[in-house]
UniProtKB/Swiss-Prot annotation, chain A:
Gene3D superfamilies named in the record: F1F0 ATP synthase subunit C
Localization, UniProt: Cellular thylakoid membrane
Assembly: F-type ATPases have 2 components, F(1) - the catalytic core - and F(0) - the membrane proton channel. F(1) has five subunits: alpha(3), beta(3), gamma(1), delta(1), epsilon(1). F(0) has four main subunits: a(1), b(1), b'(1) and c(10-14). The alpha and beta chains form an alternating ring which encloses part of the gamma chain. F(1) is attached to F(0) by a central stalk formed by the gamma and epsilon chains, while a peripheral stalk is formed by the delta, b and b' chains.
GO MF entries: lipid binding; proton-transporting ATP synthase activity, rotational mechanism
UniProt name for this protein: ATP synthase subunit c
Length: 81, 236
């Protein structure tokens, strides 16, 4: 791999995870806020709310994970090298 | 020096050459071991069944209840029984491979190249599982509704047709990438931390990894059930 390609790959890998973490971060914050408000309003529904919250967290997290997959491909299985 | 429990060997595999096909041997080894363990575990638990369950049988009945509830809420009362074995198999296999990859110190066994680990940390395993899910929701839709299944593609309006067709491709893609990325990310984070601070500090991260692995198995099974439920659902 020439040095330009490897430098660009490393920068792109960093950007893929970094930018990809912004949206899900905001979304998880919103979801947690909603869950906390829901629990405060109706403490007996805590179990159900927690289950749904964890499931939706995992969905949001998977968006960042897609970025991570792209980063891993660039770092370990680079198609341009 | 402490033995190295995790290392960063992402692109390296133990290759088996069979004809023209190159197989990733370490994935086969670990998944055979874990499947064997699962089989032994379940046949021990169901060998002497009693009316009021104890020990292993109790645990297995709890699992059965859990999987049945999952399938029933996603697929619906009418056909969930047909799909419960499939959903249960997916859930147990993914769960056992995630936890087996994290809990068993595979690193102590030296391989000529690559390392043993969770079978689901290899993209081929997860893509195979995701394609199985795709095939089964097509089969579920076609066998339950016949050609009327394709009404689903134009259901609210025909404008949705291209998006629904695209969805058939993005479903397996996201299903496989989600599982693969999460499990590989867990292994990588633990690997990096062990590399930086070999003592104590990686332990909370390992627990977090176990937690996310269990959630990912649940999500994989839930989504598979949801796709099947979407395919067999009747529109009015």
């Amino acid at each position: 791999m020439d040095s330009i390609t490897s430098a660009a790959s490393v920068v792109a890998a960093g950007l893929a995870v970094g930018l990809g973490a912004i949206g899900p971060g905001l979304g998880q914050g919103n979801a947690a806020q909603g869950a906390v408000e829901g629990i405060a309003r109706q403490p007996e529904a805590e179990g159900k709310i927690r289950g749904t919250l964890l499931l939706s967290f995992a969905f949001m997290e998977s968006l960042t994970i897609y970025g991570l997959v792209v980063a891993l491909v660039l770092l370990f299985a680079n198609p341009f090298s | 020096m402490l033995p190295n429990f995790a290392a960063l060997e992402v692109g390296q595999h133990l290759y088996w050459q069979i004809g023209n096909i190159r197989l990733h041997g370490q994935v086969f080894l670990t998944s055979w071991i874990l499947l064997g363990a699962l089989l032994v575990f379940i046949s021990l638990g169901t060998k002497k069944m009693e009316n009021d369950p104890k020990g292993l049988q109790n645990l297995l009945e709890f699992l059965w209840d859990y999987i049945r509830d999952l399938a029933r809420t996603q697929i619906g009362e009418k056909v969930y029984r047909d799909w419960m074995p499939f959903i249960g198999t997916l859930f147990l296999f993914v769960f056992v491979s995630n936890w087996g990859g994290a809990l068993i110190p595979w690193r102590l066994i030296k391989l000529p190249s690559g390392e043993l680990g969770a079978p689901t940390a290899d993209i081929n395993t997860t893509i195979a599982l995701a394609l199985l899910v795709s095939l089964s929701y097509f089969y579920a839709g076609l066998s339950n509704k016949g050609w009327r299944y394709f009404e689903y593609y134009v259901h609210p309006t025909p404008i949705m047709l291209p998006f629904k067709i695209l969805e058939d491709f993005t479903k397996p893609l996201s299903l496989s990438f989600r599982l693969f990325g999460n499990i590989l990310a867990d292994e990588l984070v633990v690997g990096v931390l062990v590399f930086l601070v070999p003592l104590i500090l990686p332990i909370p991260v390992m627990f977090l990894g176990l937690f996310t692995s269990a959630i990912q198995a649940l999500i994989f099974a839930t989504l598979a059930a949801y796709y099947i439920g979407e395919a067999v659902e009747e529109h009015h």
